[in-house]
């Protein structure tokens, strides 16, 4: 049961992480490299 819960958490987190990376890269590409120090 723990493995199923862990795999569900991983399968839920991986697309969100990839989507977040794409969104941040897209926003930095749109605005130029002015906002690289905002994190």
Swiss-Prot record:
The 4 large subunits of the cytochrome b6-f complex are cytochrome b6, subunit IV (17 kDa polypeptide, PetD), cytochrome f and the Rieske protein, while the 4 small subunits are PetG, PetL, PetM and PetN. The complex functions as a dimer. It holds the Pfam family PetG. Keywords: Chloroplast, Electron transport, Membrane, Photosynthesis, Plastid, Thylakoid, Transmembrane, Transmembrane helix, Transport. This is Cytochrome b6-f complex subunit 5. One of its GO terms (cellular component) is chloroplast thylakoid membrane. Component of the cytochrome b6-f complex, which mediates electron transfer between photosystem II (PSII) and photosystem I (PSI), cyclic electron flow around PSI, and state transitions. PetG is required for either the stability or assembly of the cytochrome b6-f complex. One of its GO terms (molecular function) is electron transporter, transferring electrons within cytochrome b6/f complex of photosystem II activity. It is found in: Plastid, Chloroplast thylakoid membrane. One of its GO terms (biological process) is cytochrome complex assembly. It comes from the Eukaryota. Belongs to the PetG family. Signal peptide: none annotated. InterPro entries: Cyt_6/f_cplx_su5, Cyt_6/f_cplx_su5_sf. It is a single-pass membrane protein.
